[in-house]
């Protein structure tokens, strides 16, 4: 089996995917823009060959790289980056080289555009917040009048909180439409939801059924975290509620999420709202057909005592898991600190106090630090009370 892994060097933990594929007997070929000599030794040992391109945005270069591998190794069976940024290019390469193990260009829209995602959530019988897409400020005002303030605007094709706006009144909404003009149609307007994000994460088989699934919770608004108003904090829950599992499995079927990682996002309402539901009810938010970002895959591993990189590689090579799934169910949390801020408990003291619970304390590159923090702490706990005590110690600021 020939597997072309796109950008195997970034994110930095993605060498694990290549390593597990190779362990399963897969011929792993890499395409990236990093010089070969800068690749980690563990990645080099997992790759049969690496083709460096000057610019991964240049599709002609990517075609030449794929053509080279096809000529040298025969038909390519898989192309995957497991990276949101390259999903559309992955699909285009599959289309051009007739690779049938993943989604092609004609279908990629449902994995990228939020407005299209809403229709697939509806197909799965999953409620969502009300929304509209328009470049007409009058229509936008009418929508806001219907759903009430505040109103959220997000890029229809985008990920995370990048480019997200929160309008508290008509003046702010009008200013946005004046600035954007016709480009406002590239945004989706949504009613505001007071909820925490809960996810359905895992690996799906060729029938869009989960081989393994877990869930993590982000109590604070992603937009507030991204804008620096709230610290990075989220955790893997030890169990998935029956309602969330039912919705997650229905969404996988509706979206046709076959043979791939999935990261499905839902709102769990903090307060009741007549148009949405009661506190605790779950709404569909958006889908990401790749692993959750940052160190979440590692956190899922720590929480469950498994190797999700290996489970994914088993799916690729064998269509099912050939290695153990979760051996236990713990909380695993991630807290992020920013270098420019002071915290009540110094770094070294935090490391010492929680040395038996800490799984990792990585520094983040600048490209990720703005949203997540410069310094992360990943720790596992048997119970929620111990985890919340860690949160207080990790994130508490000095008293004024």
Residue ranges and their predicted role:
Residues 1-106, 138, 321, 383-399:
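ATP-binding N-terminal substructure of ATP-dependent carboxylate-amine bond-forming enzymes
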Residues 191-257, 261, 268, 272, ...:
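ATP-dependent carboxylate/phosphate-activation module, predominantly the ATP-grasp catalytic core
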Residues 94-163:
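A conserved helix-loop-beta module that forms one wall/lid of the active-site cleft
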Residues 69-76, 145-147, 182-183:
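Glycine-rich phosphate-binding loop signature in dinucleotide/nucleotide-binding domains
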Residues 136, 167-171, 346, 383:
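Alpha-helix N-cap recognition
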Residues 121, 144-166, 184-201, 213-217, ...:
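ATP-grasp fold ATP-binding core
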Residues 127-130, 150-153, 164-199, 221-233, ...:
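Conserved ATP-binding module of the ATP-grasp superfamily
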Residues 313-400:
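Peripheral (often C-terminal) accessory segments that flank ATP-dependent C-N-forming ligase machineries
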